[in-house]
Amino acid sequence: MSVAQNTFPLSELMISLTTALDMTEGQPPEHCIRCCWIGMHIGMQLELSEPELHDLFFTLLLKDAGCSSNAARICELYATDDLTFKRRYKTVGTSLSSVINFIVKNTGSEQSWTERILTTIDILKNGNDYAQELIQTRCTRGADVARELRFSEAVAQGIHSLDEHWNGQGRPEQRKGEAIPLFSRIALLAQVFDVFQMEHSIEEALQEIMARSGVWFDPKLVEVVEQLVENPRFLSGLKATDISQRVMNLPPAQAHLPLDDAYLECIVTAFGKIVDAKSPYTAGHSERVAVYTDLIARQLAISDADRIWLRRAALLHDIGKLGVSNAILDKPGKLDEAEWRAVQAHAAYTEQILYKLSPFKTLARMAGAHHEKLDGTGYPRGVNGDEISLMTRIITTADIFDALSAERPYRAAMPIDKALAIMEENLHTAIDPECFAALKKALNLLPDEYTQLPHSSDKT
């Protein structure tokens, strides 16, 4: 297995990974990148220092790093599709009537009319507490991700205070005015401007931020945006099809910060946690699949260098699930045809996301094919065994084992021996026999934290 060397800049990796963050917010592609374009031009107009522009750059790209952590709770509280809910919520006006109208229209879409009325009443009664909880969860997790990615505390705080408002009526801490970190003020302004210019027009986006000046936004920053929209180069860049490259050409992105293996591992692990945070039923899934993958690979005498990259592919194999609604992922009953197609799409999303990352181009197909089957009945391409690499077969075996042995929305965790028995029934069709044999041997070598998996003989 040949992979690219770690000579690419940190900015390239982060820009590419924003595709996944856009998905989890239900936003059009390149939302975070456009926000970075907008926010960086604000920062340059303010003549921020080089270190400040560097931190602002990554605050803007990673502003949504914690958003997967409240997806399941949104579905639970509002009984609706989290992706659609999040996308529509960002276009709600500031008036009470706009908020109430949004709640009535978007609550209970997965329920009967009677249940919907009861849920809506609950939201109208307790919505303030729920909103605080959801934003607190997202902000705290987003800041933690920034720290895990080794960014400065200024970046972490910029993400944590994204939803604070100039008038002190924001969340999670009701900070007011200049007590709100500058990076947060810029990021929220850039976010709202992009959402409205994509949904409507530049003119309407400008009207919206001007209407919120002194309420949501720092008036001085709004004035900067008013000046920017008079700049043809700013507007053409915002609408350009190559905006990713244009953002890559900004000064902070040009600072060459090569990644060593330890830092790359840190980044991959952090994004694996972002994926797993989307559902309570996927908590720890990516890490466990990576552990099982590595143990199987050891049994098959895969080289140390290839095992490192194989483990990274395993950590990110489900990153495409950020683009699937929790209303589907956490559904306790049988999926209908449309829902099943949505679930299947996650494998293709994984490949698309990873292919954008220079070091992962070779791994993209490998990770995205983890639901292919040897008999050709898998997805996304329906290829047969001859076209499925050994590396993919290893990840597939690890993924199936964890899917069976972990708790699911529709059943409790399955004992190891029962999971292995089911897997054995699917040898030569879905599961590679050599990989399965390696898994059985590898289970005796599990790290201590994985030795508590249930067995049929265990008392319940």
Swiss-Prot record:
Induction: Expression is up-regulated by 3'3'-cGAMP production (at both mRNA and protein levels). Monomer. A divalent metal cation 1 binds at residues 317-318, 399. Changing residue 21 to D/H: Large decrease in enzymatic activity. The keyword Manganese applies. Its cofactor is Mn(2+). Keywords: Hydrolase, Manganese, Metal-binding. Consists of two tandem domains of about 15% identity and similar three-dimensional topology that interact to form a pseudo-dimeric structure. The N-terminal domain (residues 1-258) plays an important regulatory role in facilitating the catalytic function of the C-terminal domain (residues 259-460). The N-terminal domain alone does not show any activity. The C-terminal domain alone is much less active comparing to the full-length protein. The full-length protein is 13 times more active than the C-terminal domain alone. Residues 28-189 form the HD domain. A divalent metal cation 2 binds at residues 318, 346, 370-371. The lineage of its organism: Bacteria, Pseudomonadati, Pseudomonadota, Gammaproteobacteria, Vibrionales. Pfam families: HD_5. It comes from Vibrio cholerae serotype O1 (strain ATCC 39315 / El Tor Inaba N16961). Residues 260-455 form the HD-GYP domain. One of its GO terms (molecular function) is cyclic-nucleotide phosphodiesterase activity. Disruption phenotype: Significant increase in the ability to colonize the small intestine compared to the wild-type strain. No defect in biofilm formation. Enforced DncV expression in mutant cells lacking this gene causes an enhanced inhibition of chemotaxis. The double mutant lacking both VC_A0681 and VC_A0931 shows enhanced bacterial infectivity, and the triple one (VC_A0681, VC_A0210 and VC_A0931) has the highest infectivity, which demonstrates that V-cGAPs play non-redundant roles in cGAMP degradation. Requires a divalent metal cation for activity. Likely has a bi-nuclear metal center. Has the highest enzyme activity with Mn(2+), and when incubated with Ni(2+), its activity is about 60% lower than that observed with Mn(2+). The active site is at 321 (proton donor). It catalyses: 3',3'-cGAMP + H2O = 5'-pApG-3' + H(+). This is 3'3'-cGAMP-specific phosphodiesterase 3.
